[in-house]
Regions:
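Repeated scaffold domains used in trafficking and secretory/extracellular systems
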Residues: 13-24, 78-88, 118-135, 165-183
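A short loop-to-beta-strand structural motif that recurs across blades of beta-propeller domains
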Residues: 1, 56-61, 104, 193
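Short loop/turn segments that connect beta-strands within beta-propeller blades
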Residues: 2-6, 64-66, 108-112, 153
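Intrinsically disordered, low-complexity segments enriched in Gly and acidic/Ser/Thr residues
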Residues: 106-170
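Extended, charged low-complexity segments
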Residues: 150, 154-204
Length: 204
């Protein structure tokens, strides 16, 4: 971690197989891991090499400002284990995630986990204001899919619309691009362009 003057203020190994990194106003760092970070690679978790347990074995870990682990996704959360953290959205001090293989939407607030089931798979970005939610991405032909809905008190996503992500220059998103959610804003990176869509736009 480097401060505004360029000085290194913290340094640590956060593990292998890092998929997402996001920080909070209080200086916390959330890290989501893909499968190699969960199950081990390059010696991590290898019993033949007496390798250490992967840092990301839980799939989602929070570190403090000194990069010490303060929380990790529990296997008792009730929404399945994280085999690959496909999407991570950090807003304030809370985090939202969507992960393989069941792709529930989960929220971590004050260390408590709540979640909502849905039928989408391959989700690459979660965009939410806490009541509404958009799930962006999918497998194959659904890579530009956008599923919007309401997060109900029954623990499931009440889908309102399924549409496609459209980028400038064409009716549908084509080519290589990256999507990520931050609060109620979807960020799209394509080439040298950085595009933003808020939740109101995704719901129209």
């Amino acid at each position: 971690v480097i401060d505004s003057t360029g000085q290194v203020v913290a340094e640590a190994v956060l593990g292998d197989g890092i998929e997402h990194v996001a920080t909070t106003p209080a200086g916390q760092t959330w890290v989501g891991y893909f499968d190699e970070g969960v199950f081990g690679n390059h010696g991590w978790g290898d019993p033949d090499l007496d390798g250490p347990e992967p840092v990301g074995v839980s799939g989602l870990v929070r570190f403090d400002e000194r990069l010490q682990r303060t929380w990790e996704y529990p296997d008792t959360a009730g929404f399945g284990d994280i085999y690959d953290c496909y999407a991570l959205n950090v807003t304030g001090e809370s985090a939202w995630a969507c992960f393989y293989d069941g792709f529930p939407v989960v929220r971590i607030a004050d260390d408590a986990v709540s979640g909502w089931t849905n039928k989408a798979s391959g989700v690459r970005a979660v965009v939410t204001d806490g009541l509404r939610c958009a799930l962006v991405g999918g497998y194959g032909a659904d890579r530009d899919r956008v599923v919007t809905g309401l997060l109900t008190d029954r623990g499931r996503l009440d889908v309102r619309c399924t549409t496609r992500l459209a980028l400038p220059g064409g009716p549908a998103a084509t080519g290589r691009y990256t999507v990520t959610g931050r609060g109620d804003v979807l960020h799209v990176l394509t080439g040298t362009a950085h595009l933003r869509l808020d939740l109101d736009q995704l719901f129209t």
